[in-house]
Swiss-Prot record:
<dbReference type="GO" id="GO:0022627">
    <property type="term" value="C:cytosolic small ribosomal subunit"/>
</dbReference>
<dbReference type="InterPro" id="IPR019979">
    <property type="entry name" value="Ribosomal_uS17_CS"/>
</dbReference>
<dbReference type="InterPro" id="IPR000266">
    <property type="entry name" value="Ribosomal_uS17"/>
</dbReference>
<dbReference type="GO" id="GO:0019843">
    <property type="term" value="F:rRNA binding"/>
</dbReference>
<comment type="function">
    <text>One of the primary rRNA binding proteins, it binds specifically to the 5'-end of 16S ribosomal RNA.</text>
</comment>
<dbReference type="GO" id="GO:0006412">
    <property type="term" value="P:translation"/>
</dbReference>
<comment type="subunit">
    <text>Part of the 30S ribosomal subunit.</text>
</comment>
<keyword id="KW-0689">Ribosomal protein</keyword>
<comment type="similarity">
    <text>Belongs to the universal ribosomal protein uS17 family.</text>
</comment>
<keyword id="KW-0694">RNA-binding</keyword>
<keyword id="KW-0699">rRNA-binding</keyword>
<keyword id="KW-0687">Ribonucleoprotein</keyword>
<dbReference type="GO" id="GO:0003735">
    <property type="term" value="F:structural constituent of ribosome"/>
</dbReference>
<protein>
    <recommendedName>
        <fullName>Small ribosomal subunit protein uS17</fullName>
    </recommendedName>
</protein>
<dbReference type="InterPro" id="IPR012340">
    <property type="entry name" value="NA-bd_OB-fold"/>
</dbReference>
<dbReference type="InterPro" id="IPR019984">
    <property type="entry name" value="Ribosomal_uS17_bact/chlr"/>
</dbReference>
<dbReference type="Pfam" id="PF00366">
    <property type="entry name" value="Ribosomal_S17"/>
</dbReference>
Length: 84
């Protein structure tokens, strides 16, 4: 019997909603450099499926992992945490 994996969830800010049913979000991580001990900000962009086009630029959103929807889309919009 296969074990079901828990789907990953992430929170990020919408940086673009110019495509149909697709938004781009940016997730920022704070990582401490192992040798220099300086805090570094790392950013990563995710293409997210937004079925009803409800999010706008600047919104804080929560996304969840899903099956591949296109070449770059592996995430789906779960909810809008905070409107701009």
């Amino acid at each position: 019997m296969r074990k079901l994996k828990k789907k990953k969830e992430k929170i990020g800010i919408v940086i673009s909603n110019k495509m149909k049913k697709t938004i781009i979000i940016s997730e920022t991580k704070r990582i401490k450099h192992p040798y220099y001990k300086k805090v570094i900000l790392k950013k990563k962009k995710y293409y997210v499926h937004d079925e009803h086009n409800i999010s706008n630029e600047g919104d804080l959103v929560k996304i969840i992992e899903t099956r591949p929807l296109s070449k770059q889309k592996f995430w789906r919009l779960l909810k809008i945490v905070k409107k701009k």
